[in-house]
């Protein structure tokens, strides 16, 4: 009813919205927690090359803020993520179990992956999003690309569908009060698939507290004990044998290079060495790596023998 009032307004259906009706704003942002982002990327990466789907839990803080605190996966995969494919029984049971574990948040939208082909909504995705918006007008659809996402840059975007009646009446789907919603330049692929015609993009932000930052920094933090980790003895033996063979080849090349230095002039020597492998440098590197790996392996074996 609020949507109809906003579309037709108080001006007799002339496209002028009522000043008292709530209007969506371009400065609305979706705040995704670190836990939710990691879960979405892990779920999307596990489903490659198929598409995967899940629901987002959080709350609508105010008219400008949607907070996503957690997500959970749905049993759908592949290209069959449609309105009929959403398992409502699984969704209800999952929400009941999450409430028992201290996660009382409501469903604020859904997410799915586009492995390798960018962030946009297809026709089936738009229908799925409209079914979520029928339950809650501010429901959000998040698309994540686990293939194009790399360390330090996550390819992700949030969308919400545009009512076709709004376009017919010549109205803007959202009012503009700041430049927050215009900071991200849309891709050509998303524009081709109906961005700003059938759906619009919502700005995404990530809010982390001190504990979350500490947790993320400790994910790939190396410890001093990592250097004492023993390798399999058969693997270590094969690596030593391969390294020694490479050292013999490099030693022969270095011996040949030394003999050429005595025979050739400096001008010819500078031309001859262009594009060649520096045998001396690689030989020193192989010797250093071989000695350090054997010292660490021997030291770790001695410590394990004494301790255990």
Swiss-Prot record:
Keyword list (alphabetical) reads: Hydrolase, Isopeptide bond, Metal-binding, Metalloprotease, Protease, Proteasome, Ubl conjugation, Ubl conjugation pathway, Zinc
Top EC class of this enzyme: hydrolase
Gene Ontology CC annotations of this record: nucleus; proteasome complex
Example GO biological process term? proteolysis
Q: Where is this cross-link: Glycyl lysine isopeptide (Lys-Gly) (interchain with G-Cter in ubiquitin)?
A: 238
What Gene3D superfamilies does this protein map onto?
Answer: Cytidine Deaminase, domain 2
Q: Which InterPro entries match?
A: JAMM/MPN+_dom (IPR000555), JAMM_MPN+_peptidase_M67A (IPR050242), MPN (IPR037518), RPN11_C (IPR056263)
Cysteines joined through disulfide linkages = none
- Distribution of this protein across tissues and organs: Ubiquitous with highest expression in flowers.
> Which Pfam families has this protein been placed in?
JAB, RPN11_C
The GO terms describing molecular function are: metal ion binding; metallopeptidase activity
Q: Where is this motif: JAMM motif?
A: 112-125
Domain MPN residues, every copy = 30-165
Q: What is its EC number?
A: 3.4.19.-
Which PROSITE patterns does the record associate with it?
MPN
Give the family, as the similarity comment puts it: Belongs to the peptidase M67A family. PSMD14 subfamily.
Q: What does this protein do?
A: Metalloprotease component of the 26S proteasome that specifically cleaves 'Lys-63'-linked polyubiquitin chains. The 26S proteasome is involved in the ATP-dependent degradation of ubiquitinated proteins. The function of the 'Lys-63'-specific deubiquitination of the proteasome is unclear.
Q: How does it assemble?
A: Component of the 19S regulatory particle (RP/PA700) lid subcomplex of the 26S proteasome. The 26S proteasome is composed of a core protease (CP), known as the 20S proteasome, capped at one or both ends by the 19S regulatory particle (RP/PA700). The RP/PA700 complex is composed of at least 17 different subunits in two subcomplexes, the base and the lid, which form the portions proximal and distal to the 20S proteolytic core, respectively.
Q: What is this protein called?
A: 26S proteasome non-ATPase regulatory subunit 14 homolog
Source organism of the structure: Arabidopsis thaliana (Mouse-ear cress)
């Amino acid at each position: 009813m609020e949507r109809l009032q906003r579309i037709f307004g108080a001006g007799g259906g002339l496209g002028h919205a009522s000043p008292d009706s709530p209007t969506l704003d371009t400065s609305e942002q979706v705040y995704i927690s670190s836990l939710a982002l990691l879960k979405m990327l892990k779920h999307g990466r596990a489903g490659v090359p198929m598409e995967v789907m899940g629901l987002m839990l959080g709350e609508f803080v105010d008219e400008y803020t949607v907070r996503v605190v957690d997500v959970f996966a749905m049993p759908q995969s592949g290209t069959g993520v449609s309105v009929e494919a959403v398992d409502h029984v699984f969704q209800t049971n999952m929400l009941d179990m999450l409430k028992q574990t201290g996660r009382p948040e409501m469903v604020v939208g859904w997410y799915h992956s586009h492995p390798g082909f960018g962030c946009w909504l297809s026709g089936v995705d738009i229908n799925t999003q409209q079914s979520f918006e029928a339950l809650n007008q501010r429901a959000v659809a998040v698309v994540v690309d686990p293939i194009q996402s790399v360390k330090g840059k996550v390819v992700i975007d949030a969308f919400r569908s545009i009512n076709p009646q709004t376009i017919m009446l010549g109205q803007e789907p959202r009012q503009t009060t700041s430049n927050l919603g215009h900071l991200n330049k849309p891709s050509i692929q998303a524009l081709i698939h109906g961005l700003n015609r059938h759906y619009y993009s919502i700005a995404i932000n990530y809010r982390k507290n001190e504990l979350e930052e500490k947790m993320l920094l400790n994910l790939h933090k190396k410890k001093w004990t990592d250097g004492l980790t023993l390798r399999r003895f058969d693997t270590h033996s094969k690596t030593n044998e391969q390294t020694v063979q490479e050292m013999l080849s490099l030693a022969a090349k270095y011996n040949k290079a030394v003999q050429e230095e005595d025979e050739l002039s400096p001008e010819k020597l500078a031309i001859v060495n262009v594009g060649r492998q520096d045998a001396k440098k690689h030989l020193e590197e192989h010797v250093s790596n071989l000695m350090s790996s054997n010292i660490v392996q021997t030291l770790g074996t001695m410590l394990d023998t004494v301790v255990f």
